[in-house]
Amino acid sequence: MAEDDLCSLFFKLKVEDVTSSDELARHMKNASNERKPLIEPGENQSMDIDEEGGSVGHGLLYLYVDCPTMMLCFYGGSLPYNWMQGALLTNLPPYQHDVTLDEVNRGLRQASGFFGYADPMRSAYFAAFSFPGRVIKLNEQMELTSTKGKCLTFDPYASTQLRFEPGELVRHGECKFAIG
């Protein structure tokens, strides 16, 4: 099946030598900075700014889905409907060694009201996006409990515009949350 082949290829695509969320953030920031001249409009070019509030910088935002959905999104150039009004993203980095995948699923399920996050495999993959100005920060917060019992808070964001430009996708891969 083509989806399985794509998933096995996708599984092999990894960011080398990244062992922590700080390293991942640095790596993605560098990659984003390298791509910036390629994706920013040049002189006399128009820039498509969403009507809902103009350009707002949120840094990197992460989408969590399963591998087949991720592949369909990438080849289709659009985000999945994983929230009642569009796509739900968060500033929770995918390499949090002190948060379990089950806890991440619980937080995503609570923030989105989306039943699909009942299965941990539904969020085993991530895509990091840099969306200049076309996401809105939701009023809720995603509260997770770390493996050490510490409360961690992350912000959920929403995008009702599901199409994305190739330059907005910064990185993608398999999540590395804590086991157990």
Swiss-Prot record:
The keyword rRNA-binding does not apply. It comes from the Eukaryota. GO terms for molecular function: beta-glucosidase activity. Hydrolyzes cytokinin glucosides thus liberating free cytokinins. Keywords: Cytokinin biosynthesis, Glycosidase, Hydrolase. This is Cytokinin-beta-glucosidase 2. It comes from Panax ginseng. GO terms for biological process: carbohydrate metabolic process; cytokinin biosynthetic process. Its EC number is 3.2.1.-. The lineage of its organism: Eukaryota, Viridiplantae, Streptophyta, Embryophyta, Tracheophyta. It is an enzyme of class 3 (hydrolase).
